[in-house]
């Protein structure tokens, strides 16, 4: 959620810059005194707004969220249609300039890039965090995740092709790449439209993630892994307000002091780690419980598919720097300490 908020801030700063407006340097970047930046204020403000909205009435906010998704698709359509008329096939002359890369420990190539681009596939698991509010979750949750993955992967492929066809990849090391590409080819109206839509719709991503994370904290508290305070719900809107406040405050602090690249790397490696554990759990579950019931989702090709997933995830994890591994280790230690000193004693399982 923090990293998405940082991306939102980047698009807003890009839009403001196109009109000649800039924030003071001290409040326009992550904490780095040597560069004169101390806090990235915009992501903090948007997360405060998102948290406040969810505390008031999460169901109404989620309805607004669904409407804004339509705007998001319209911005992608504008970019694709405009970009098709400005493609330069020479930009695709060397489709893999750094090759495949190394299976383990690489810094360049497809593997290293894939380990970072994995960030674009985060969030789908949040659907499973709302099972208490979904009809027939055994059927609809897996179907929703698979369908969303198919749609989004297809869009990613098309947008990436157009993006690299319009602007050479060496010039795309920016946080607002789509809007930058449109400005690069001189289509300012489309760039501004994409920026405005991104500013509006990235808020919806923050809302979805904040909603899912607060429900995860609520579920952990309900099961005894976190203090019972976090399972309390407000009397008026039936919102887990303490859980929502916790996720909002921690995310706002992170978005204000850490860079987008660092947050993305930490989120990626953490997600890859739990996907490894998920694949292992699936193998064990299939062995102990047998095949799913008739109306339940059945993962195909077990154990081949989970084993392949483990290998791929570990390969991606090996691409990260020791700094990312250190941050991941600290996060694991904090989580383990919470479980050891509280969750183990109070768990209902």
Task: Annotate the PLM regions.
Residues 9, 38-89, 145, 264-277, ...:
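Membrane-interface loop-to-helix entry segments
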Residues 14, 75-79, 216-217, 267-295, ...:
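Hydrophobic alpha-helical segments of multi-pass membrane transport proteins
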Residues 39-44, 135-156, 188-191, 218-256, ...:
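Loop-to-transmembrane helix boundary motifs in multi-pass membrane proteins
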Residues 51-52, 80, 160-162, 199, ...:
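Alpha-helical transmembrane segments of multipass membrane proteins
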């Amino acid at each position: 959620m923090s990293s998405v908020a940082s991306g939102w801030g980047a698009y807003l700063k890009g839009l403001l810059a196109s009109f000649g407006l800039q924030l003071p340097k001290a409040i326009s970047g992550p904490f780095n005194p040597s560069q004169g930046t101390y806090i990235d204020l915009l992501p903090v403000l948007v997360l405060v707004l998102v948290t406040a909205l969810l505390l008031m009435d999460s169901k109404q906010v989620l309805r607004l969220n669904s409407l804004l998704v339509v705007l998001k698709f319209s911005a992608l359509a504008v970019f694709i249609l405009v970009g098709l008329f400005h493609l330069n096939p020479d930009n695709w002359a060397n489709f893999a300039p750094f090759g495949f890369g190394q299976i383990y420990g690489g810094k360049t190539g497809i593997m290293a890039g894939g380990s970072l681009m994995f960030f674009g596939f985060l969030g789908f698991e949040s659907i499973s965090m709302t099972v208490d509010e979904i009809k027939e979750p055994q059927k609809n949750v897996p179907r929703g995740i698979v369908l969303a993955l198919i749609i989004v992967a297809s869009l990613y492929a098309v947008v990436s092709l157009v993006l690299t066809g319009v602007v050479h990849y060496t010039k795309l090391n920016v946080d607002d790449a789509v809007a930058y590409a449109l400005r690069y080819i001189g289509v300012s109206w489309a760039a501004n439209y994409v920026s405005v839509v991104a500013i509006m719709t990235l808020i919806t991503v923050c809302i979805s993630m904040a909603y899912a994370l607060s429900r995860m904290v609520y579920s952990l508290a309900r099961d005894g892994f976190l203090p019972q305070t976090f399972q309390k719900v407000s009397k008026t809107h039936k919102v887990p307000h303490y859980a929502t406040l916790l996720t909002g405050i921690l995310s706002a602090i992170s978005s204000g002091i850490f860079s987008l690249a660092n947050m993305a790397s930490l989120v990626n490696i953490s997600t890859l780690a739990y996907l490894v554990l998920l694949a292992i759990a699936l193998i064990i579950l299939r062995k102990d419980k047998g095949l799913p019931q008739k109306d339940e989702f059945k993962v195909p090709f077990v154990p081949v598919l989970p084993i392949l997933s483990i290998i791929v995830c570990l390969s991606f994890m090996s691409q990260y720097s020791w700094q990312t591994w250190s941050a991941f280790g600290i996060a694991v230690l904090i989580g383990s300490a919470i479980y050891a000193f509280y969750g183990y004693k109070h768990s209902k399982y």
